[in-house]
Amino acid sequence: GSEQRLWRVLSGHSTLQVSAFMDENPLGFGLAQRARSFDAYQDAEARYEKRPSAWIAPQDGWGKGTVTLVEIPVQNEFNDNIVSYWQPADTLKAGERYDFNYMLSFAPEPPDSAPIARVVETMSGQSVNNATARTFVIDYDLDVFGSDDPVAQIKASAGSIGHSYLLRMPEQGRMRLAFEYIPDGAKLADLSAVLNGAGGALSETWIARWTRE
C-alpha cells in the first residue's frame, strides 16, 4: 500500500524462518523467480529456469495486516518449503464472513510496471578482508538509473555494516552494490539495501535474512 517495493531473498536456512512485512491495503505480493538461464540450475529434467512466478494482486482494500513468509528447512529439492500468505491484523472470528478479492497470476514476471530498478542477482560469501565478516553483492538493472548517481542506504537489524561500494557495469547492463556485514556476535539479522536518488528510491528495497549456521 505504501508503494514501496520489497525484494526478499530466499535462502536455504537450517532452521525454520518466519518473516512478517506489515502493510495496509497491499498492492501485490508473491513468489517471483528471476534466474531464467539453464546455467543457473543445470537440471535437464526439472527445468527450474522455466518455472513461473506466482503473484497475488488484491482487487479491493484488504486493510491492515502482514505478508508472512515461511522458509522451511529441507534435505532435498523434492520438498516444497516456501510459503507466503496474507494475515489480517484483526483476528478473524468464527462464524463471520470475510471477502478477499484478488487476481492470481502465473507468469515469468509479476504483472506490474514498477518504474524502478529491479534486483537481478544476489551473491554472498566470506569477506576476503575480514574473516568474521560476510560480503553481499547485489546487481540491479542499470537502464533505469540513466545518468542519476544513486546513493546506497544499507541497514542491519543486528551487527554492523562495513565497507561498501557502488559500481556501474555498462557492459553487463548492471549496477552493482557490494558491502560487508559484520555480525558482532549476532545470531540473526535482517539486512536491507536500497538505492536512492534526489526524488526518492530508484530501486527495489533488497532484504535478506542472515543466520549464524
Report residues per predicted region.
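A contiguous, surface-exposed recognition patch within enzymatic or periplasmic domains that forms
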Residues: G1-D99, S105-A107
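Short beta-strand elements
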Residues: G200-E213
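Short, hydrophobic beta-strand segments
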Residues: L177-D184
